[in-house]
């Protein structure tokens, strides 16, 4: 199924389709991985004005929370493409996973994405999948651009003197944006 999506994606030469179509096709690709089966439940939540979803499995502790930031080069990627991965992360860690659709380029420039993620992390400290309530453990994680964001968010929280996550798990972080690297 992923192979068909790749062929479809690269056969499109109509630039009028734009970023919206590019993002949608990218999400189709990531959600089609048959090796990552979705499990548990996911439900939408308003994260202080940012669209989000809580992802949980039967062993998820609602007071142990991970803010997971999707990859996508700071320009693509949404919650939809990461639900399966988040459900597996919830199952393996026993945590509740919060996914958010943070601001993307080129529509919004730096530091909008970091500010959205900081706002979501602060919100998550006091709000869980069961509503208001403090968390006992908090984590920030992400892959690629999301991994870079997880580092940037944590450093920005530190600079602000805000509460820090108990741990950060950056997967293949795109942390250096210099074109030389």
What are these regions (language model features)?
Residues 10, 41-181:
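Alpha/beta-hydrolase superfamily serine-hydrolase fold, recognizing
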Residues 1-57:
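A glycine/proline-hinged amphipathic helix-loop "lid/cap" segment
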């Amino acid at each position: 199924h992923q192979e068909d999506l790749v062929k479809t994606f690269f056969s499109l030469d109509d630039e009028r389709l734009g970023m919206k179509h590019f993002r949608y096709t990218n999400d189709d690709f990531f959600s089609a991985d048959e090796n990552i089966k979705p499990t548990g439940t996911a439900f939408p939540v308003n994260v202080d004005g940012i669209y989000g979803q809580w992802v949980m499995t039967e062993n998820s502790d609602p007071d142990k929370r991970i803010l997971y930031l999707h990859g996508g080069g700071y320009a693509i990627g949404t919650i939809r493409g990461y639900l399966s991965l988040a459900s597996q992360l919830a199952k393996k860690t026993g945590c509740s996973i919060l996914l958010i659709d943070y601001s993307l380029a080129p529509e919004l420039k730096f530091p909008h994405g970091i500010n959205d993620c900081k706002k979501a992390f602060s919100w998550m400290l006091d709000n869980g999948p069961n509503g208001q309530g403090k968390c006992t453990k908090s984590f920030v994680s992400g892959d690629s651009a999301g991994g870079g964001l997880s580092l940037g968010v944590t450093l920005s929280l530190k600079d602000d003197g805000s509460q820090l996550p108990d741990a950060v798990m950056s997967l293949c972080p795109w942390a250096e944006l210099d074109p030389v690297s």
